[in-house]
Amino acid sequence: MTTQSEYDYIIIGAGSAGNTLAARLTEDAGVTVLLLEAGGPDYRLDFRTQMPAALAFPLQGRRYNWAYETEPEPHMDNRRMECGRGKGLGGSSLINGMCYIRGNAMDYDGWAKEPGLEDWSYLDCLPYFRKAETRDIGPNDYHGGEGPVSVTTPKAGNNPLFHAMVEAGVQAGFPRTDDLNGYQQEGFGPMDRTVTPKGRRASTARGYLDEAKKRDTLSIVTHALTDRILFEGKRAVGVAYLVGDSDTRIEVRARKEVLLCGGAIASPQILQRSGVGPAEVLNKLDIPVVHDLPGVGQNLQDHLEMYLQYACTQPVSLYPSLKWWNQPAIGAEWMFLGTGIGASNQFEAGGFIRSSEAFEWPNIQYHFLPVAINYNGTKGVQEHGFQAHVGSMRSPSRGRVHVKSKDPREYPSILFNYMASDQDWQEFRDGIRLTREIMQQPALDPYRGREISPGIDVQSDEALDQFVREHAETAYHPSCSCKMGTDEMAVVDGQGRVHGMQNLRVVDASIMPIITTGNLNAPTIMIAEKIADKIRGRQPLPRSTADYFVAGDKPARGKPLREISHQA
């Protein structure tokens, strides 16, 4: 527990970005940092967060998960949908699926075309991805070998379904790639994961804080719920927070800056509660307006996905591992040897494709899983099976986050506005139909049984749309709600500094202007690494000179090995 009342920097949120900043800022001698986290420690003996294969467990309770819900989503049968966010040291890196996916080079080149974001091109960002990473098979032009984030690659001898699913994607006419984070993201191939060589989850608490905690210049307070940021005029001077169930406000001062790293839900929420945001929202709640900034909480984006599930005709799926009587042996091997089923998140193959020539870079992502079950561990199919998670990457739909009261313990109002555009519906129809073509390729002949979900009778546009409305779920990638840029809806500049304010930055997935093509943990860490150098007054790392794939006029798909006709 801290006793000081003043620090150089106060960081709100010990998630993927906050832990990165805390570690990097305290590398400079004499720089004091207070890291505030509303959740608790990352208990290293709790298999639910430390065992990769147990990734569904933290989503089922509230110890590690804020477990937000959306408002009724108007295009999704008015379902209130899950919006799980990490709570505890590590933030969402403590409960995520551990997929290490950086996004497409064109995502960052697209950001860099926006005024004020010119230094966010892919070749500007790549050195920071490398700085953060230690890849188990060693560094190269795309991968790091000395960073805090431990990345494990799939190995020979893993589940045969991974290999079969990648081969099926290639047989369907799509590219093959040997590294989804390397020269070419587009195509099917092995998927890296944030797991240590000893088979433990490589959260940012493990990667960054374990080293930083040794410095007496870093103070960490857990169970510290931020009430609001304190201002003198337009200058951030400190933070007021509550500890545990107490209503006693503790105030601490920042000599240099307040760094908000709460993520795409909490960061706009804290800004609004502090009086920075759309005046119309704040006035309704009698929150004094410090700065009318209309973009705070707007532009909210996410990835939506569906599961296409198939029975498996050979007993090679992970179905037996779901049975309680098999789990002690799996747990013991993982605990004592760091190997076996427990040591993998089981997302060891995936892919990125263009569903039509209209897209310059991939717009559909696949995760393959050698068992048929919901992401949060519910509704496991009671037989051998496998599934593909399929989702669109850059939906035009935009949502918002608004506070509902001044009370820091009250959850905000969240609306993603999923599937609000015609493009969304076309992408999901195409995604299901292309997946069915992939699943019918010869590589899966030895394994493929009947289609469990959606079911072979779901064929028409109307039937597919209804399936999406009823069954699509979040991929847990909220972002973009405090976007970088210079237009009237931008919240921060290209260094994370809040427009119109002093000594206040937002550094997390909320500042993405447009969501990236893939999972968000790796990009969030990169963003924090890059802005850490700005805060420290350091020269940016030299631009990379690595080559990268641009599709140009290359076709999205070649001729499939086996032609499949769609039923109407």
Curated annotation (Swiss-Prot):
InterPro entries: BetA, FAD/NAD-bd_sf, GMC_OxRdtase, GMC_OxRdtase_N, GMC_OxRtase_C
EC number: 1.1.99.1, 1.2.1.8
Pfam families: GMC_oxred_C, GMC_oxred_N
Domain of life the protein comes from: Bacteria
Gene Ontology biological process terms from the UniProt entry: glycine betaine biosynthetic process from choline
Biological pathway: Amine and polyamine biosynthesis; betaine biosynthesis via choline pathway; betaine aldehyde from choline (cytochrome c reductase route): step 1/1
Catalytic function, reaction form: choline + A = betaine aldehyde + AH2; betaine aldehyde + NAD(+) + H2O = glycine betaine + NADH + 2 H(+)
GO cellular component, one term: membrane
Family: Belongs to the GMC oxidoreductase family.
Function (record text): Involved in the biosynthesis of the osmoprotectant glycine betaine. Catalyzes the oxidation of choline to betaine aldehyde and betaine aldehyde to glycine betaine at the same rate.
Name assigned to this protein: Oxygen-dependent choline dehydrogenase
Gene for this chain: betA
